[in-house]
């Protein structure tokens, strides 16, 4: 399993909480959350989303020519459960 940053786990959690979100849906969800101090920019969002896609934790699909959708995989859900168990100890 790839080691994720706290920010990447935040993106993974957002993908889990939303239904077929676009990258911008994920950005808005994270920006609205209590743990994000400043608005996220494109240069931070998409490379980190790509990392969790490449790790097999999220699948990237197309909504249209300009918009991708991100769907959490079973491995992504397992990673969130493992992280939650680790943080609760």
Please name every model-derived segment.
Residues 81-89:
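Amphipathic alpha-helical dimerization/coiled-coil segments
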Residues 43:
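Key DNA-contact positions within bacterial/archaeal DNA-binding proteins
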Residues 2-40:
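N-terminal helix-turn-helix DNA-binding core of bacterial DNA-binding proteins
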Residues 53-64, 71:
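Beta-hairpin "wing" of winged helix-turn-helix
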């Amino acid at each position: 399993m790839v080691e994720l940053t706290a920010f990447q786990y935040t993106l993974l959690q957002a993908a889990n909480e939303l239904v077929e979100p676009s990258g911008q849906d994920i950005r808005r969800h994270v920006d609205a959350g209590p743990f994000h101090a400043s608005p996220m920019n494109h240069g931070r969002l998409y490379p980190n989303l790509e990392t969790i896609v490449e790790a097999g934790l999220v699948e990237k699909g197309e909504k249209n020519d300009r918009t991708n959708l991100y769907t959490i995989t079973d491995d992504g859900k397992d990673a969130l459960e493992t992280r939650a168990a680790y943080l609760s100890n």
